From Swiss-Prot:
Keywords in alphabetical order: Cytoplasm, Methylation, Protein biosynthesis
Subcellular locations according to the entry: Cytoplasm
Organism: Chlorobium chlorochromatii (strain CaD3)
Pfam families: PCRF, RF-1
Name assigned to this protein: Peptide chain release factor 1
């Protein structure tokens, strides 16, 4: 393990030198690739540095314990050795987790599809609530988000469907745990008897594909244009700027109406289509690798009920790991860190267990 960590440290230094090369400014694609790789290694290098410092301190304390004759000093050295041994063991465990094989897609940006399910108007309102939750979480993480497409419901403020693009560092690696069915239990504003209604919204988190990931034949595509129902000033309902693309072999559809020109909407819709096809390809690869563990945390099973938001009890429960929080208002404002961190830690523990078997 130490040899592997040393090699990573040297690679990190090489990347640092490469990124300082002024000529790299002329090749933005290579710069982004190197910078992403550099960022991915930084956490491992920092953890390894901390491990090495504490291991050196432990060695010095053990030497003092072995050579010291003064009783009081020996007792102090013994206490320090015990404390440092515990710290070094924790850091070593952390390094083992960091060295787990990274999923290639983890560093990708994402497209999130949020769809109202059972529950009618209440489900569409909760779809809007989840949209705001993810937008605020993205803001807290320093990520960028953009609405690509949406379908409003009959109730004001509700959505039958919302499609978001979120871009930033390690977005899919963080957001992939959100795929699945989110259930809400609350009393609708229109409920005169005060009865609790249960509704559901499905969330699909897809790693954004690059052009090289998926080959799409133009002959397999059908392009339709229609009038945008969203923003666009004088273009609204007058010019067909919205674009819908259908991939004929699979029947997969991607649409975008949020850009101001037909060309921009077409480019966005193509990106969404590539992402959907890449997601299918990725799922097939994961299945072939038999990488489906007992836990459903990262399998992305979108038919599985993953979380319940109980408003009367101000409770959020993630059913995959038995996690419960009574900070529902804060979570709905984007404070998802505690939930996602618990899911990541559980997933890492399961993967480490699998690696050691």
């Amino acid at each position: 393990m130490l040899d592997k960590l040393q090699a990573i440290k040297e690679k990190h230094l090489d990347l640092e030198q490469a990124l300082s090369d002024p000529s790299l400014a002329n090749d933005q694609e290579r710069f982004r690739k190197l910078n992403r790789e550099y960022s991915n290694l930084r956490e491992v290098v920092q953890a390894f540095d901390a491990y090495q410092r504490k291991a050196t301190e432990l060695e010095a304390a053990q030497h003092l314990l072995a050579t010291e004759s003064d009783t009081e000093m020996k007792a102090l050295a013994e206490a320090e050795v015990d404390e440092l041994q515990e710290t070094v063991a924790e850091l070593e465990q952390g390094l083992k987790i960091l060295l787990l094989p990274k999923e290639e897609a983890d560093s990708r940006n994402v497209i999130i599809e949020i769809r109202a399910g059972t529950g009618g108007d209440e489900a569409s309102l909760f779809a809007a609530d989840l949209t705001r939750m993810y937008q605020r979480y993205a803001e807290q993480k320093g990520w960028q988000y953009k609405v690509l497409d949406y379908n409003e419901s009959s109730v004001p403020g509700g959505f039958k469907e919302m499609i978001l693009e979120i871009s930033g560092n390690n977005v899919f690696g963080t957001m992939k745990y959100e795929s699945g069915v989110h259930r809400v239990q609350r009393v609708p504003d229109t409920e005169a008897q005060g009865r609790i209604h249960t509704s559901a919204v499905s969330v699909a988190v897809l790693p954004e594909a690059e052009e090289v990931d998926v080959e799409i034949r133009r002959d397999d595509l059908r392009f339709d244009t229609y009038r945008s129902g969203g923003k666009g000033g004088q273009n609204v309902n007058k010019v067909e700027t919205a674009v819908r693309i259908t991939h004929m072999p699979t029947g997969i559809v991607a649409a975008c109406q949020e850009e101001r020109s037909q060309l921009q909407n077409k480019e966005r819709a193509m990106q969404m289509l590539r992402t959907k096809l890449y997601d299918i390809q990725l799922a097939e690869q994961q299945q072939q690798r038999a990488d489906l563990r007992r836990t459903m945390v990262a399998t992305g099973d979108r038919s599985a009920k993953i979380r319940t938001y109980n408003y009367p009890q101000s409770r959020v429960t993630d059913h995959r790991i038995g996690f419960t929080s009574h900070a529902l208002p804060q979570i709905m404002q984007g404070e998802l860190h505690e939930v996602i961190e618990a899911l990541i830690m559980h997933d890492q523990a399961e993967r480490l267990k699998s690696e050691l078997q």
